[in-house]
Amino acid sequence: MQQRVIVGMSGGVDSSVSAALLLQQGYQVEGLFMKNWEEDDGTEYCTAMEDLADAQAVADKIGIKLHTANFAMEYWDRVFEHFLAEYAAGRTPNPDILCNKEIKFRAFLDHAMTLGADFIATGHYARRAETAYNSKGEAYAPLLRGLDNNKDQTYFLHAVHGREINKTLFPVGEIEKPEVRRIAEELDLATAKKKDSTGICFIGERRFNDFLKQYLPAQPGKIVLDNGKEVGEHHGLMYYTLGQRGGIGLGGMKGASEGAWFVLHKDVTNNRLVVGQGHDHPLMQSTQLWSESIDWVAGEQNIPAEGLRCTAKTRYRQPDQACTVFIDENSEHGVRVEFDEPQRAVTPGQSVVFYSDEVCLGGGVIHHTNAPTPNFI
């Protein structure tokens, strides 16, 4: 009997080719287009209808049914409110990670099961290993890096539990992006030449500062140098991220050298933005970070007393960094990560993700680091 797969079809080339490949592999395939954001009608940002039309065109071309589902309420409650709270607290969140955990691999998976699916599939560049069992006897599938190292998306998938991965297929995870484009062109799919989306998960390509302003009041404050000297005003700490180059508004400052300006520190208590010159400024350097809660793909924490040797990324596409992970005795579920080499601009609110060779072990949100605090704070 054919196994039934529901493919999350976004209107992009990766999910389009995923559906086509699964058909070729003999699965009974249907698509599902998720609407996860209520667009402001008539705005320039309204891409959801275009994406739905593209997904429908592909479904028609390859001869499969396309379902639609609206998860906008779930997205608002489980992802967007957290996103706003993090920005309000002066941190820089990554909503795509929470969106994958709560929407694409929970709300979508649950909905697909009501449609009689054996598996869901997505267009992510990741792979899964054969079903394994943790020490509690729970079945899960280990998460593996995508074959195309340049496109690997396990950084964004680390918070998805292995039991959900066990119900998921990643058809394009086994091939490289140029091959995906080639397959789409060969099959004459409407999405073959469509550019990859880069906006916030489900919110699209809108101007970020304008978008954030609609939900959080801007709180302007002082810009200060690393010695505490006031040199200007910022528009609100939420618009800046640690290590950011430029966009600070200090070009041509009298008496300053020609070098670029970088965001070194966000003094949330006093609403001050600390800036300085030098790509590797000491205030941006850290060797340790703390995370208060870790999502382990296997559903359990296996950190020996002497620490877990592995590699980690603190941002997407960063080369793997050697580290040791320790249980944080001061936190119920947290860890302390000690890097072999100093790290630049590790950003609270972003995620640290752990790897053992090809296997993505899991990760968590960065709470704080041991980067030095400016001496005037």
UniProtKB/Swiss-Prot annotation:
Residues 151-153, 315-316 are annotated as: Interaction with tRNA. SUPFAM superfamilies: Adenine nucleotide alpha hydrolases-like (SSF52402). The record marks H124, Q350 as: Interaction with tRNA. One of its GO terms (biological process) is tRNA wobble position uridine thiolation. Residues 94-96 are annotated as: Interaction with target base in tRNA. The keyword Zinc does not apply. It catalyses: S-sulfanyl-L-cysteinyl-[protein] + uridine(34) in tRNA + AH2 + ATP = 2-thiouridine(34) in tRNA + L-cysteinyl-[protein] + A + AMP + diphosphate + H(+). CDD domains: MnmA_TRMU-like. Its main location: cytoplasm. Keywords: ATP-binding, Cytoplasm, Disulfide bond, Nucleotide-binding, RNA-binding, Transferase, tRNA processing, tRNA-binding. It comes from the Bacteria. This is tRNA-specific 2-thiouridylase MnmA. Pfam families: tRNA_Me_trans, tRNA_Me_trans_C, tRNA_Me_trans_M. Belongs to the MnmA/TRMU family. Catalyzes the 2-thiolation of uridine at the wobble position (U34) of tRNA, leading to the formation of s(2)U34. Disulfide bonds join C99-C201. Transmembrane segments: none annotated. InterPro entries: MnmA-like (IPR004506), MnmA-like_C (IPR046885), MnmA-like_central (IPR046884), MnmA-like_central_sf (IPR023382), Rossmann-like_a/b/a_fold (IPR014729). NCBIfam families: PRK00143.1 (NF001138), trmU (TIGR00420). GO terms for cellular component: cytoplasm.
